[in-house]
């Protein structure tokens, strides 16, 4: 019965309902395809006829898939791309300009700093208040070393280099200036002990010459007086021999001792050894 009803339902025209039989009617399903005849070569689904289901989302056709790539939207995307490129170009130009401005500012700041530093250096070099250094000679004197002692010929004692007495007469070549010296020659100061040493040396050299000259004068005067004294002694002894011959006290030695011989005179006047001049005198 069911198969017969199915066949009757298939033979009905499309859109028509089956006649009621046996107290009930059969209705075709809306989702089932229309089948006109059953055969082995017949296609169950026909591709030419497409029907959509009710109460369901609409299915887009193949033509609807190409809607995004419509010729209306292509120029809009191109315009957007052109605008974006122009914006990028503007951004690049702005960044390049900003970089150039920053480089120029940095260069100007560096120039200002260098000029300010050079001005500060010039002010430091020109102002005497900021120069507080002691000039040091390239070849320092051994008598002016730190912690050394110097022998002062004027004071006749050892004097430390830090406690040197100030010179009463200032040196004309030594200048007490606080300016920065431009040549190393100004840094070399003459030694304070130089003229004192030379003065002492000249005094020591001149003193023995004076002593020697004085001794030669004394010797020459004594040598000139000795022949006169010898002549007086010989005349005196001859007179004594004539007046009192054979006397024991008339010997030339005793007479020379009593009357004052030139030997005693030379002993009292000169520091040299006495010379016996009576041995050279002729004895009568």
Swiss-Prot record:
Main location per the UniProt record: nucleus
Compartments in which it is found: Nucleus; Cytoplasm
Region: Disordered, residue numbers: 1-32, 112-198, 235-284
Keywords: Cytoplasm, Nucleus, Protein phosphatase inhibitor
InterPro entries in UniProt: PBIR1/2/3
GO BP of this protein: mitotic G2/M transition checkpoint; positive regulation of cell growth; positive regulation of proteasomal ubiquitin-dependent protein catabolic process
Composition-biased stretches (Polar residues): 258-269
Coiled-coil ranges from the UniProt annotation: none
GO cellular component entries: cytoplasm; nucleus
Bias kind Low complexity: ranges: 152-164, 172-184
GO molecular function annotation: protein serine/threonine phosphatase inhibitor activity
Purpose of the protein: Acts as an inhibitor of serine/threonine-protein phosphatase 2A (PP2A) activity. Potentiates ubiquitin-mediated proteasomal degradation of serine/threonine-protein phosphatase 2A catalytic subunit alpha (PPP2CA). Inhibits PP2A-mediated dephosphorylation of WEE1, promoting ubiquitin-mediated proteolysis of WEE1, thereby releasing G2/M checkpoint.
Protein family per UniProt: Belongs to the FAM122 family.
Protein name: P2R1A-PPP2R2A-interacting phosphatase regulator 1
Gene name of the record: PABIR1
